[in-house]
């Protein structure tokens, strides 16, 4: 590294207070550049700051006559003398005189180094004077402006930072000045432009790869951007270059402690850090001290970490025993370790060193509170309160006030207000601080956990019931804990307390997830096992509850002394019906030390107060089990004991409420209400008592007016945002949203920044169907700066109202912001992107929808990466959301026929949520569409294994069995569903289709009978009529089919399909091959007769009328409608109409890849227009496509038409292959049998021809006379005269005038029978 690089390194280490580093770099500079006195000066300065004043004096004396450093050396000599306990006044006077003389004659360099030295010792204003003088001299260097910028920036204020950035930019115009680049980084950091700062650091690393502070900066900036992975990578890279790098070791230790929660690895890194400090900064007491702060506050009072930290502090104190702040910190360490006597000693030592040390006094008050010296603590706190305004608010002193108020049994609301002030004051010091070492120190999770514990002591110990509003105290706890877990996800105590908050909030699922996460990292956490037992108990999982209690006891035998342990055990025994055992367990709990005030020793006083709510719960549970055991007298006796025991305490009203609950359980609502009415506004449980009364009025007496009166009384007597919120929620409970809006607005007036209230008002307006007002309200709320979550609600409403463009604008506005790192903000963005995709889908912009979903997927990947550490309770829901996003992308891909992509995303969805039956079903269906039967069967079987009653999966399994030609199994699966529910018409319609494809339509009628027997009104059901129509259509009875479909056509569920089927029947009642030529002239002149022509035209007009009734809601539905409209045009057989249809089909085929109905339409049009080669090309294209159930009918028609073309060309083998394919997928396909018969007849294989015509005659239900004619003719040729005569009679019975059959076949068959 060159001279300038080394000097920048020295400046950096001076500012960071790494004085041994200064010494080492200066030594290196002296070796490389022995003629440069600057390095000798900083060697002396480093020596001085390490406490070796005499050695430093000698070094400064040796260089005080060197021109460039003479002025700063004289200043340094004065500084040394002034630092001395007994300063030499004469020497100082003499040096001052010399310095003034030197200053008059000093050149640019001398002034620059003097300014630099003054900056390093914190004399900013004096330094500026020297730099200003220097700037007035002629120069061609940027040194002065760059140092001036550094002076501005180290003031740490935004306006100065702006000006400093300008100076640094000017300083960089002539090249990459490393000192200016470092300054620019700091400027951007102060302005919170961490990405920009990181870019600049990268610039330093590229140009100066051996400049290690750049890597340290990079590491800290990556942490500020909350990218722990990159931070760790940079730290490890640093250690490869310098294995004693203090910052890298500190960062890795913090990573293992805060992020991973791996205490052993963190302790190892701390050990390495201590060794590195001994080598690199052995005399730096301040560094030893400052390094401990973040660790002691984030380790969750882990003894291993605290012992390491203590050794650092003891080293620091041994180096500077006069430092009161280090003694104070040692006192705090003793508190954290539970060594109160040791803490007293260190706090008193600190007071001796500095009588005005506020932190030491605060520590002493804390000791007094722990020891129960309430009067002394009260006096001290009173004294501090008098001058707290002048010294600024202290969160810790407020907290001690709150603790004292709790111990003195002050009103709950007073304690809550104090704790609220503590939190607000504490978090005000964190504003604008990025994630980093200072943030961890200021956040002080340990302190916040103490505050949360105090909050929780004020909460009801019973979880909130369903629909019960969340307690503001619990909401506050949740907010504080979210902040801790977001920053220090490796802290098990925070995760445990979050689980407790979730449990008390009634969210047992979230509590369970948090506890699982907590116990994975800390399996011996006894209290977590205890809470897990409570969670299991609330979920009625009694065996698991018992297992958790056993685990708890195995990890900590002392839990037998916890009343809570016995309480949970008794409750689980009660649930198992072991009431007598529960009574024994509770009596054991009643005999525990501290359970009764009269028995409580001073030693157990603190713990008794903390567990007061659990003590009361033991009493109340004992009342309950005695009552259940029929021991009413004993129950009443225990309740009286509870009244006596808790009289005058903050728990007294819980006894009253429990007494009311007991009366209520006995059906005495009057007595319950009488007790609750006695609770006054001044008492702590007033709101809870009123809520209980309201509940009685609503649920037991069904008196809505008295119910709402209770909440009105709360709002009148205690007018607060919470009271009006409760009133609003109460109005919503009784379906009075207009009144609810008024109450919510009153709450919002008192708390205008509460986004939750704004959302409630919006939702209430939507509930009143006042949509326009709701939109106006949301828009106004957003303009006034309400939370961005309102954007989502507004967009959702606009989507619901089909105002797609407005919804798109709202969502785009909500997403148009700088990149965010807050987890909650990322979640909002993810949800907004998914909603935007829904909007795009409705606007028929599938590519934009997929793009939005891809954005959501990327966001969700980031969320999942962080949520496991920061919000473990949210992991299942976030994984489910990630699966939904992937499934949506898969659906869009499948719609665009990109099946491979669809399968990839469905698989990804199952990685997130492997048990999601809906996604598994969709993937199985997709595999089926891809003809991958084994993969489809595998997923379907797995799904049915988990849920054997899953209807769609059973239907899919039936499809699969059909594809595998296992028809009996296919029918069996659908029969299973119908046996369970005979009137399941969706399944019945599918079964009819399946029996048709199996060639067993004769089995259908019995299922109609089953449905009719199941419900006498079945015949009136549109689904039943639809299924009947389907059966008649498939059995060659088009008129009956139309009649039944007509009865279903107005139904919302069945109507659209019924209409499509009716249109198809109108266009092709006899199920002919439209466009086919083989059978075109078989019926002679019947096809061209006026009656036939008129009948066709009438049918087309009917189809056109029916088309107008179709109202498709999807893109595919609208496409299907277009296809049908053009099929109507083709049915007219008029050239212009057919050509018009052909153009439309061609357009669709061009825009929709492999669209079978459009390709079939084109082929049919070409056949009608007598352009057979073009038709054949399209049909051959279709023939290469795999079969799928959705397009089965069109595929069948395509194969039949292509077979017709091949037969016309006498390519019978190719035709047979296609016809066999038709029969493979539909054994009732009359037309396929008819064509096969025709081929056999042409080949004079009359027996085979007769067999195929026989199948065609059977499956057309003997209704088609043309098929009957051909069958009789081939019987005649095969010499089966009796069969030929029977068929002739069947045809003539239905069609007496059918031409030629009598003369050509009947008479000849009879003649052949005569001897």
Swiss-Prot record:
Alphabetized UniProt keyword annotations: Cell projection, Cilium, Cytoplasm, Cytoskeleton, Repeat, TPR repeat
InterPro entries in alphabetical order: ARM_TT21_2nd, ARM_TT21_4th, ARM_TT21_5th, ARM_TT21_C, ARM_TT21_N, TPR-like_helical_dom_sf, TPR_rpt, TTC21A/TTC21B
One record GO biological process: forebrain development
GO molecular function, one term: chromatin binding
One cellular component term from this protein's GO annotations in UniProt: cytoplasm
Keyword NAD (UniProt): no
Protein localization: Cytoplasm, Cytoskeleton, Cilium axoneme
Positions annotated as TPR repeat: 108-141, 145-178, 192-225, 285-323, 324-357, 492-525, 563-596, 616-649, 721-754, 756-788, 790-821, 830-863, 883-916, 918-950, 951-984, 1022-1055, 1196-1229, 1231-1263, 1265-1298
Described purpose of this protein according to its UniProt entry: Component of the IFT complex A (IFT-A), a complex required for retrograde ciliary transport and entry into cilia of G protein-coupled receptors (GPCRs). Essential for retrograde trafficking of IFT-1, IFT-B and GPCRs. Negatively modulates the SHH signal transduction.
Self-association state and partner proteins as the record states: Component of the IFT complex A (IFT-A) complex. IFT-A complex is divided into a core subcomplex composed of IFT122:IFT140:WDR19 which is associated with TULP3 and a peripheral subcomplex composed of IFT43:WDR35:TTC21B. Interacts directy with WDR35 and TTC21B. Interacts with TTC25.
Family: Belongs to the TTC21 family.
Protein name per Swiss-Prot or TrEMBL: Tetratricopeptide repeat protein 21B
Organism: Mus musculus
Native organism taxonomy: Eukaryota, Metazoa, Chordata, Craniata, Vertebrata
Name of the gene: Ttc21b
